[in-house]
Regions:
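C-terminal substrate-binding subdomain of Rossmann-fold SDR/epimerase-dehydratase oxidoreductases
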Residues: 1-110
Length: 110
């Protein structure tokens, strides 16, 4: 499980920390409080790109021996000290990213 955070939300948190004396010498996890598996993310992307018109099939490699399977950051300090909560959902991030990537592909840039 991983937490995916929109860069604009991260920038907001950084600005809040820069302008808050209570943030000096403190550490913050700047993240959403919602976790997703890689399969969850793949399904979301697939549905946004293809809808239900095509079946999604998975192929798996062996997992990395020392991979952390579940990463759940505590966002308590960011909320309590900075007043920060990530606002942008992963679905909203994908709605912005997918057209941008499609455009770059159509221009031959990727």
């Amino acid at each position: 499980i991983r937490h995916y955070t929109y860069a604009g939300d991260i920038a907001t948190a950084i600005l809040l920390a820069l302008n808050n004396e209570n943030a000096i010498n403190k550490s913050f996890n700047i993240s959403t409080d919602v976790g997703y598996t890689v399969i969850d993310v793949a399904k979301m992307i697939w549905e946004k790109v293809h809808g239900n018109s095509k079946d999604l099939k998975f192929a798996f490699d062996a997992p990395f021996q020392y991979d952390v399977k579940c990463r759940i950051p505590s966002v308590v300090n960011a909320k309590n000290i900075l007043g920060f909560e990530a606002k942008t959902t992963l679905s909203e991030v994908l709605d912005e990213m997918i057209p941008w990537i499609k455009n770059l592909v159509s221009l031959g840039k990727i």
